[in-house]
């Protein structure tokens, strides 16, 4: 579902599907209530990809009273997209996807007039320190780049290959009373500002249960996260692959080789009143975070 607004999906169960269960892009205000992804009795797999995926959405995302089981990919992935600077001239930025995609860029996936670009600093190409309001956006004739004219003067330190994110692609997130079990990789991937994960249970995941990761290297998924609360959750038999150690909740970042990454990226991330069973000695690791 793309370019949509005020979406409610309630009381739906998906037994099996070759692909994702529910995919949303460039959409606003999405609620899932009683959304279940579970295989039929006697089968071990439900989906070959994510149960839910939210790309460059805004407004709010709410997932409550839902179950995710047997996927070959994540229960949910909430993220924006990094744009990589190609050229700079006065108040205009020419940018491409930070991760190459063999597809044409559509105007619907680009930032909109009135949005705010998050611009990095010289010491860390992924930490936003400067902001510029978008005046206009167009797509290049070859559909491989966007041309963004800003209302504000751009800082002198901006350079080619720096990562740019969009402030509005940080929806407020509430995930409550949900269950994740028997998943090949992870549970929840969350990249946003303002998220609460409450009263959820995670069991038998191959990788970490919750991942908060700005990723400029592999997928180009943004961005730096802040004001994240994980509370009253239960984690059991998490990260059997021992990825990054036996960690259940992991905040980190992936930089492109050779680019500067001094200091932190993420803001406040808190894990409170959670129970960890068979999750390793140190089940919570918060890297590149202002309050580890």
Model-derived regions: residue spans:
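Conserved, compact domain cores that house catalytic/ligand-binding motifs in diverse enzymes
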Residues: 2-6, 10-11, 15-20, 28-29, ...
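Short glycine/acidic-rich loop motifs that flank beta-strands on beta-rich extracellular proteins
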Residues: 18-24, 40-50, 59, 72-78, ...
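Catalytic cores of secreted or luminal carbohydrate-active enzymes
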Residues: 67-85
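Short alpha-helix capping/helix-loop boundary micro-motifs
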Residues: 93-107
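Ser/Thr/Gly-rich low-complexity blocks that favor extended beta-strand/coil architectures
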Residues: 105-142
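Small/polar beta-strand repeat architecture
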Residues: 128-177, 181-182, 189
């Amino acid at each position: 579902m793309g370019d949509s607004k005020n979406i409610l999906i309630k009381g739906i169960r998906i037994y099996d599907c070759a692909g994702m269960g529910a995919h949303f892009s460039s959409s606003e205000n999405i609620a899932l209530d009683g959304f279940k992804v579970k295989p039929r009795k006697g089968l071990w797999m439900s989906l070959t990809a994510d149960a839910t995926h939210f790309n460059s959405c805004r407004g709010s995302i709410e997932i409550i009273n839902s179950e995710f089981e047997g996927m070959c990919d994540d229960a949910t992935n909430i993220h924006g997209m990094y744009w990589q600077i190609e050229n700079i001239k006065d108040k205009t930025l020419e940018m491409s996807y930070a991760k190459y995609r063999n597809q044409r860029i559509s105007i619907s996936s680009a930032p909109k007039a009135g949005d705010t670009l998050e611009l990095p600093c010289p010491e860390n190409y992924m930490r936003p320190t400067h902001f510029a309001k978008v005046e206009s956006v167009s797509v290049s004739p070859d559909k491989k780049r966007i041309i963004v004219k800003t209302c504000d003067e751009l800082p002198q330190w901006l350079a080619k290959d720096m990562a740019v994110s969009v402030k509005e692609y940080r929806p407020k997130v509430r995930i409550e009373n949900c269950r994740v079990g028997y998943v090949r990789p992870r549970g929840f991937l969350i990249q946003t500002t303002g998220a609460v994960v409450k009263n959820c249970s995670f069991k038998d995941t191959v990788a970490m249960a919750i991942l908060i990761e700005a990723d400029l290297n592999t997928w180009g998924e943004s961005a730096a996260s802040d004001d994240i609360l994980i509370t009253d959750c239960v984690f059991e038999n998490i990260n059997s692959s021992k990825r990054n150690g036996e960690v259940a909740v992991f905040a980190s970042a992936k930089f492109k080789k050779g680019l500067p990454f001094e200091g932190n990226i993420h803001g406040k991330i808190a894990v409170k009143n959670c129970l960890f069973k068979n999750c390793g000695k140190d089940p919570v690791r918060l890297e590149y975070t202002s309050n580890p």
